[in-house]
Amino acid sequence: MLTVKDIVSGYGDVDVLHKLSFEVKHEIYAVLGANGAGKTTLMKTLARWLPLNNGTIEYDNEDISDFEPYQTAAKGIAFVPQENNVFPDLTVRENLSIGSTLLDKKVRKQMLEEVYDVFPDIYERSNQKAGTLSGGESQMVAFGRGLMQNPKMILLDEPTAGLSPKYVGMFFEKVKQIHLEKDVSILISEQNATKAIEIADKVMVLQLGKIHLMEDAA
């Protein structure tokens, strides 16, 4: 379980998040809000890409507030940032392998097979340069790379931004599938409220860095 208590975070001397507190259990938790609400700042803070100015973050009863990003990953939390971070000159398989450097060879092979099971389109393009993929395909590779860490929790920061309707629907289907089949908790920030609510167990709405609403999804 992820437990967030009164966190304050931002960039330099500017606080973007103001005393946020919530828990993520074994569920899909959607974080909604307009541009500038603090969604990306929250995701980067939870992944320990941004420092805390106040408050604490605990995962599985361990304080991870002072963790570095690699320690968070080793703890079982995978982060898929909004920015397209695939390496265009590497193949799809090579991009996926980057996400599994902390695992031994046998587990890496097993995770690669599982990723291909979830994303058959990725398997068909495994030897293709990532730079030739569409935006939707690239995002699937980024998601797959997060799965390659064999995580217990995945943080997805606005993963459908800029995707075509076809890939938006497909992506949300994969999120639900992975949660159910892989026993993974998922925290997803989104502007596409309708789709996110369809798959979420709980919903949080951020407004100017504060929690405006927090409730079970309908």
What are the residue ranges of the model-derived segments?
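Catalytic Walker B motif of ABC-type/P-loop ATPase nucleotide-binding domains
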Residues: 154-158
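ABC-type ATPase nucleotide-binding domains, specifically the catalytic core motifs of the NBD
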Residues: 12, 92-110, 118-121, 215
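A short, proline-enriched helix->beta-strand linker immediately N-terminal to the Walker B motif
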Residues: 148-152
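Conserved ABC ATPase signature
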Residues: 129-133, 137
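The feature captures the beta-strand-to-loop junction immediately N-terminal to the Walker
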Residues: 32-34
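Helix-to-loop junction immediately C-terminal to a conserved catalytic motif
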Residues: 47
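Conserved ABC transporter NBD signature motif
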Residues: 55-64, 75, 108-110, 213-215
